[in-house]
């Protein structure tokens, strides 16, 4: 039987990230053959990963990496936020994101076949991480953005990597691109322009907003406040010429009823029309970045800010860890009872 030296154990640990006892056991099992020991640990890791496959991994980090005219963004999940601050986990996120930016895979299957810096495939790296870290570790998603030489990337991560953003801007400097990435991190838009919002989505969001108004009106009724009206429209897509013309006529009728002199109507109507548009584009303001008030200067929208700069937002990606994942609700008392059996 081959002698298992401390140097052999150290080398195997460096190659696989395994613990001391696991590395020593692997070498004993394969009589000191380093390559076989690596494969032994990988097989063992795949078995561990399979056992953890059904677990919910909703914590983790985003990764952002810019490589010349290519930028990558990733979301890597773990089961607990404790693990997401682990040095090995952070290193895996950064290296996987860099590998994806350089390899430009077309889909997840292609991404998993990319070779990491140590020669291991990206997919195997996550299997190995699951085995060595002890939690389900998974690359949930990634996106790539490319730009031309005269465009700028903005890259930003917020709250220690819980949110990651990439922007692509035309006609802007790097600082503007980053500031817009910061805005997107904070305001969580879904699309660039209201034109991209689906009609059914607008209708659904109007229903959500009107439900909130109903809840507010219940509170207002308790203090004898006038109820707020329901929103009829939510997007500029819905504000046709006929809708705007009717709104203008309604404003004129209101001014007439109030006894305002007709000669001053032209000074009043534009402001009231803008208020009508603002009130009836709430879905745009929540979900379309160009319609949102710019967080660096809320006196203007992002669209107005970019127009002043002579810039155009070409694309963006925003990832937030765990969004859309239904997290398991832990019952601590039940867990303790189970352990006491």
UniProtKB/Swiss-Prot annotation:
SUPFAM superfamilies xref list: Elongation factor Ts (EF-Ts), dimerisation domain, UBA-like
Keyword NAD: no
InterPro entries from the UniProt entry: EF-Ts_dimer_sf, Transl_elong_EFTs/EF1B, Transl_elong_EFTs/EF1B_dimer, Transl_elong_Ts_CS, UBA-like_sf
UniProt main location, coarse: cytoplasm
GO cellular component: cytoplasm
Database matches in Pfam families: EF_TS (PF00889)
Positions of the UniProt region annotated as Involved in Mg(2+) ion dislocation from EF-Tu: 80-83
GO molecular function terms attached to this record: translation elongation factor activity
PROSITE patterns according to UniProt: EF_TS_1, EF_TS_2
Superkingdom of origin organism: Bacteria
Localization, UniProt: Cytoplasm
Record's keyword terms, sorted: Cytoplasm, Elongation factor, Protein biosynthesis
UniProt-listed PANTHER family: ELONGATION FACTOR TS, ELONGATION FACTOR TS, MITOCHONDRIAL
UniProt function note: Associates with the EF-Tu.GDP complex and induces the exchange of GDP to GTP. It remains bound to the aminoacyl-tRNA.EF-Tu.GTP complex up to the GTP hydrolysis stage on the ribosome.
The family this protein is said to belong to: Belongs to the EF-Ts family.
Protein name: Elongation factor Ts
Organism: Lactobacillus johnsonii (strain CNCM I-12250 / La1 / NCC 533)
